[in-house]
Amino acid sequence: MFPRVSTFLPLRPLSRHPLSSGSPETSAAAIMLLTVRHGTVRYRSSALLARTKNNIQRYFGTNSVICSKKDKQSVRTEETSKETSESQDSEKENTKKDLLGIIKGMKVELSTVNVRTTKPPKRRPLKSLEATLGRLRRATEYAPKKRIEPLSPELVAAASAVADSLPFDKQTTKSELLSQLQQHEEESRAQRDAKRPKISFSNIISDMKVARSATARVRSRPELRIQFDEGYDNYPGQEKTDDLKKRKNIFTGKRLNIFDMMAVTKEAPETDTSPSLWDVEFAKQLATVNEQPLQNGFEELIQWTKEGKLWEFPINNEAGFDDDGSEFHEHIFLEKHLESFPKQGPIRHFMELVTCGLSKNPYLSVKQKVEHIEWFRNYFNEKKDILKESNIQFN
């Protein structure tokens, strides 16, 4: 006979979660009341709370001491749970390291994302990695989808030079300048795109028309046409097509002799037209090519005559000088035209210089010289008020 084991451990109340193997609740639920009065073994009903047979722990003994044994499967589950927890911890560490490496390798360009890459002063550091990831996600979400062309290196260098010259924070100043320049570039690009008319291919195709030339096709020579043999069997309807394809030429066939042949073939007289400038220049070039050097004085005189240099014999140096019919002294002695000017003073001195220059000018006629002196007389008469203020007499 075996004595009844009256020692029981406290049991956990019934819950929805299954009991893990090797836990104190499972061992407590597996305690049984052993009796051998009727030769049978009785189990406590609380031992049936576990869902699987492997989780049931059986305890047997020949005395008041309780003997407990664990299944091999429970030991394996504990080892696997430890391994899974360790693998999860290692995966978390690896993911954190990967995220840190990605964040370090990321470079947010100023042209694609309008975010300040430099840390502004008096800003607290981020508390956790999640905050940095959230900010980067927001920046990429609100970033413009279309690609913006980066600024030229000359503008970037100029902005950095301006930032270095200012007493403020260099990085923030440079980023602000570059953002302003980028905004200006975007506005100008948008204006250019708005000015460009949008080409619609459907409108172009709808407006297109097939141009058909009104001119007849080039007439082919009859000898170049393909001529079939006389014994060739014609199919029905070929005669009509041949009649349509035949072309009549006014210069072939039998003449009717209605018009006179000589009157038709006589060419119309060409009208005399003056040679063009290019023809004259070409004739001069031909003459210079064929021209030989002058051998005597007569040939030289002939050449001068062709050039318009005519000489009178005996030689007179004043030939053609008296075209207006004036004498020689009238060209030189011009003091008689200065009677209305003052006898002395700056005006008299100025007019004497004018007459001296006119007397030495062989290209002006006497009439032109007198008109020149009269112009000065009228000019000084108009400026009498100014001359009086300057104490200059003009009588």
Curated annotation (Swiss-Prot):
InterPro entries per the UniProt record, alphabetical: MRP-S31
Top-level taxonomic group: Eukaryota
Entry-linked Pfam families: MRP-S31
Keyword Cell cycle belongs to the record: no
Transmembrane portions of the chain: none
GO CC entries: mitochondrial inner membrane; mitochondrial small ribosomal subunit; mitochondrion; nucleolus
GO biological process: mitochondrial translation
UniProt biased composition (Basic and acidic residues): 183-196
UniProt GO MF annotations: protein domain specific binding; RNA binding; structural constituent of ribosome
Transit peptide (first-last residue): 1-65
Region (Disordered): 70-97, 175-196
Alphabetic keyword roster: Mitochondrion, Ribonucleoprotein, Ribosomal protein, Transit peptide
Subcellular location: Mitochondrion
Subunit-level organization: Component of the mitochondrial small ribosomal subunit (mt-SSU). Mature mammalian 55S mitochondrial ribosomes consist of a small (28S) and a large (39S) subunit. The 28S small subunit contains a 12S ribosomal RNA (12S mt-rRNA) and 30 different proteins. The 39S large subunit contains a 16S rRNA (16S mt-rRNA), a copy of mitochondrial valine transfer RNA (mt-tRNA(Val)), which plays an integral structural role, and 52 different proteins.
Family membership noted in the UniProt record: Belongs to the mitochondrion-specific ribosomal protein mS31 family.
Protein name (database record): Small ribosomal subunit protein mS31
Species name: Homo sapiens (Human)
Gene expressing this chain: MRPS31
